[in-house]
Amino acid sequence: MTATKEESQKLLTSLRSQRDNKVCFDCGAKNPTWSSTTFGIYLCLDCSAAHRNMGVHISFVRSTVLDSWTYAQLRVMRVGGNENARNYFKRHGGVSLLNSKDCRLKYSSKTAKQYLEKLKSLAVEDEANYPDILDMDFLSNTHEGSSAADTTNEDDDFFSAWDKASVKKSDDNLDDKTDLASTSSSVVVESGEKDEPVVVTEEKTMVSPPSRPDSTSTTKSKTSSISSARARPIRASSRPTASKLGASRPQKLGIKKANADIDFDEFEKAVLSSESAPTKKPAAVASKESTVDTLVDNGVEEVKESTSTTVQGKPVKPVLKSAASAKSTKSDDSNLNANFARLGFGQFAAASNARAKAAAKARELKKNEVNAPTYARDHFASQKSISSDQYFGRGSFDPEAAAEAQERLSSFRDATAISSKSYFGEEEDENEEGESSHRPDSAYLRDIAETATEDIEAIKVAIHQGAEKLSDFIQKVGARYNF
């Protein structure tokens, strides 16, 4: 039985307003206006054409806007839908079929046939439970079920799951930082040279932005690190315990979060001071280095200083230099320059060298152009074309013959016409000229008469042919118009 237009439009509009029904089941295009009444799914125009090509025995396509619907078809659309079809395929081993582009394989499979049987049973139950096809309780229950599924199943929405995971992770980090802020640990490290203990205090990690460390503690740490031997401070674990104080946590592979108390200003000052230190040398250090250099040149193996020289209030360790160390320093400098060049430093010098090479090559090309031979321009400048034999003076080319021909042609510069005998310098036969000039008039007239006779015969033939064509044309016209 066919439903009215108002009933079908009201029901289909409500069904198409659901989230999963707003996209095509096959390709995901938005706002589908076609549907497969066999499977209760919504399709776009292109996918509906593919379903129509499969045949009505597999999928029967109807328009949700223009076509008329039966109550049985509307029941299938009520209990079906894109979400129900997709979930059924996933639960019954049809995930690969959902991703397949072969519609005939997808909708002729065993899973699709089982889904058709399921739709038929659901349609019968729906008709028994809701006799009125426009019963809104069915739609409200459907909306409530879909909303509950959205709230419980977090894996369906990838982006919401990602946001929730990140929020949870940030909360855990805040808890860790709060626990760490409540406790602080200090570790005593003894220096290698002196018995004075150096206290390395671990700063508190707070949730608020990190504060810059005090200048006094920084100065103290620098002085202790310079005066003492190389001693590595022991960092306490992020969660110190009473039983294992100062024990290091097992290292883990992966990405580690940087500490929040990094002071980049201190790093910059240290780099600038290290760069400016070689440029500003005290007189004592300069004299000491000059003395060491002279001793190295004389072949002294080692130079030891008994007293340490104080530079800018900092103790300087004894300097030990030898000839081998000087050579190694020079080799290290050369290797360093090569490494810097390989990394890209010094590109301007390479560019200048390339420009110098290009300029030298251009000068060489210009010099070659100046020294190029001018034989072709001197000998063949006025000619339009030349041959290879003529250019190289070989084969059948004879320069003397060519010069003679040029002279012969120059003698006929003002002549309007020339003969072959006059060109090659042969004497003309006077008898032939006399006979041609003294021919009798009768022979001349005879030639004219013969020529005229032939022309007259040709004219007669042409006139006869024209008359025949004209008569044929007149007969055809008379036969066509009956006159």
Curated annotation (Swiss-Prot):
InterPro entries registered for this protein in UniProt: ARFGAP/RecO, ArfGAP_dom, ArfGAP_dom_sf
Mapped zinc finger ranges (C4-type): 24-47
Keyword Zinc: yes
Keywords: Golgi apparatus, GTPase activation, Metal-binding, Zinc, Zinc-finger
Matching Pfam families: ArfGap
Domain of life (superkingdom): Eukaryota
Coiled coil: none
Compositionally biased intervals (Basic and acidic residues): 169-179, 191-205
GO biological process per UniProt: COPI coating of Golgi vesicle; endoplasmic reticulum to Golgi vesicle-mediated transport; intracellular protein transport; retrograde vesicle-mediated transport, Golgi to endoplasmic reticulum
Subcellular location: Golgi apparatus
Keyword Transport applies: no
Domain Arf-GAP residue range list: 9-128
Region annotation (Disordered) ranges: 169-250, 420-445
One Gene Ontology cellular component annotation held by this UniProt entry: Golgi membrane
Family annotation (CDD domains): ArfGap_ArfGap2_3_like (cd08831)
Main location: Golgi
Compositionally biased region (Low complexity): 213-243
Job description of the protein: GTPase-activating protein for the ADP ribosylation factor (ARF) family. Involved in retrograde vesicular transport from the Golgi to the endoplasmic reticulum.
Protein name: ADP-ribosylation factor GTPase-activating protein glo3
Native species: Schizosaccharomyces pombe (strain 972 / ATCC 24843) (Fission yeast)
